[in-house]
């Protein structure tokens, strides 16, 4: 019988056909657009973390709430928790010190300096994929142990801050003196979708160091925080692990000394867990049944907890005092001879064959063990460069303590951006080069000063294109992930930014603005650069018949060259900036995807990205002065011409060569080439979502709205690093 007959019969019985059958009709079920078109442009990445997902609302002020926190009482509660062993997850040696250090470490350790994404700054360990990564087994228990404290203090302390503070308190409770703690990490309420964790489809897929160099992600295997502790691809070879260790720690901005200190310091306390084979371990939190309530990795081996716990599958205790800080890691590393063995779970590890039984059992005081080490621990002894550092730390424990304190602080604060974002009573006074330090302000320009400066800029002979371009070049280095870059500091005038190809305009424009700064001595160069953009946009809007005052907030300062880490700032150089029609390499993603990436780093929404590109094109801000995307006969006028001409069916677009990167727009009737464009231009007509936005600004009644929206988005970018205004 046909489907039609089936439906007819159902209707004739009075039953609704849509209530029959077993198909999943819930929202979001079924085949999605990305199933049909897997290469679909990810415009949705620009819609993350909106107020619609934030239960606290847009008026919530975390810094204000934190100021109400009884910080001393919170630390006291955390200290008490460390020895309050719970039967559902008993503490090793009666202390959660090692567990909380690992939780903080693995939260921060996803950071990578190449794009500033990852890290502990938003409490992402609560969400997939990190909450269910193979390397994060049992950290769900650490977070549940913290819940009563989070519940007690509520919104006065974010999860993101609490995770790191718990690690700090654990170190302090072990007798270690930390470098300090800066709060200020604000929670988000959904997983980050923009972080590229890699292309692998299976957990623990090995990445060769050469591949890591081309795509510097945070780990050497999918699902790990750093490296495989059994060596690359479970090789069991300490020496072969050296390259992987350097690659992954280097991708976080760590040098060899910091790397050695972090590995040794992290392995001075606690243990790994590998009581039996991984086959006993159940589903991770995301895959666990609903009754598990977000807990995962339930073990069927013995009690499943305590002495029977399975986490990494390795069963290693490094030191004689696993809950107290010591130099035993290095002492044991060099004192004993190590032989390869296997854990009860079958994982490769090393045992000190000539050592007495000096390691306490975590649950039976009558038992002792020989010292054990991970494959990657022995790398610190057998790699020549790591060995030099390790022996120095062996012979100078104070140097080790200082190095670890600083490296731990860097690890846990690396993605927070400038020190101006830190809050709390334990913020260190010392400025550190990786914080991109800035000097104290020298100027407090008045409104009259600003008016006079604008007049001087307007009379300088600079074009609208030059003024707008130099301001964008200065501000657009900002990265929302780790809050680095931006206009404050005027680092556009310093190495390495002044020498980037994309910033060619700086060589022409900065000398003019520097002369104005010296002559007037009323504002910083950083402020004058941004003010030049203000002048350019106001002139362009006036030429379009719209009188508008572009908001300007003075107060920026000028960084010195010695406050600028050239190597680390080199990572901010864009491989593409679609706002300026710039692309340095064609072997990395598509031009339009890189435009989305840039917009996401600038925390822009899709409408903001759209209006900025359209406005910058008609203002002639292409990095090389080309006419690509300049769809107007009146450049320098802040018009909607980009959108109107892009969507005009009078033109037909065709690629100029097989690269499909550059296109010609020809008149359909005459065949005459009217415009040229890149993929960063044409995407606003080809992508259905972006075309819908472009159509808004192409309408005849959109001109005033366009100018206002452009100015609002522009000011947002100029002030992204003005944390003093936020």
UniProtKB/Swiss-Prot annotation:
Q: Which cofactor does it need?
A: heme b
Please give the CDD domains that the UniProt record associates with this protein: catalase_peroxidase_2
Which superkingdom heads the taxonomic lineage of this protein's source?
A: Bacteria
Per UniProt, heme b binds at 267
Task: Supply the PROSITE patterns for this chain.
Answer: PEROXIDASE_1 (PS00435), PEROXIDASE_2 (PS00436), PEROXIDASE_4 (PS50873)
According to UniProt, the name of this protein is Catalase-peroxidase
Native species of this protein?
A: Salmonella paratyphi B (strain ATCC BAA-1250 / SPB7)
Q: How does it assemble?
A: Homodimer or homotetramer.
